[in-house]
């Protein structure tokens, strides 16, 4: 929940952006300031917790949303996890990279279809599957 002062600041910023040419400004309905500088302290706590965790060699290539690039070494994993808490998500760049590297089917697991909607805006040619129930997951895996 935003304070009245913060709400007014957001309204002022949205109006300025629209005057500058933005087509629209949409407030997001989120439960916290995820992936923002406001969570830097949480990232530091995560870094402390990860100190005792051993990261093994990477066997399955994956892309971090911090850089929209592949994680190349186990030494980078903890740093990227910590940064992800308070860094912007490079979702579009990550998806574009995966598509460029041959991915043509994406699965969104969990409630809602937000990411699937973003996917369709990025590239309508890829297949997007939504799974929000265990039965749907089992059906997808056993197809």
Regions found by a protein language model. Give the residues of each.
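Acyl-group transfer acyltransferase/transacylase scaffold of fatty acid/polyketide systems
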Residues: 1-143
């Amino acid at each position: 929940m935003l304070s009245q002062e913060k709400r007014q600041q957001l309204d002022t910023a949205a109006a300025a952006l629209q005057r500058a040419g933005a087509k629209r400004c949409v407030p997001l309905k989120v439960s916290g300031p995820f992936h923002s500088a406001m969570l830097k302290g949480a990232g530091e706590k995560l870094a402390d917790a990860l100190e005792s965790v051993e990261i093994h060699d990477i066997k399955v290539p994956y892309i971090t949303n911090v850089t929209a690039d592949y994680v190349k070494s186990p030494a980078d994993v903890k740093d990227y996890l910590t940064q992800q808490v308070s860094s912007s998500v490079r979702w579009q760049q990550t998806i574009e990279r995966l598509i460029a590297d041959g991915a043509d089917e994406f699965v969104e697991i969990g409630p809602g279809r937000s990411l699937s909607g973003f996917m369709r805006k990025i590239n309508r040619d890829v297949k997007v599957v939504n799974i929000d129930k265990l039965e749907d997951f089992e059906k997808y895996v056993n197809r």
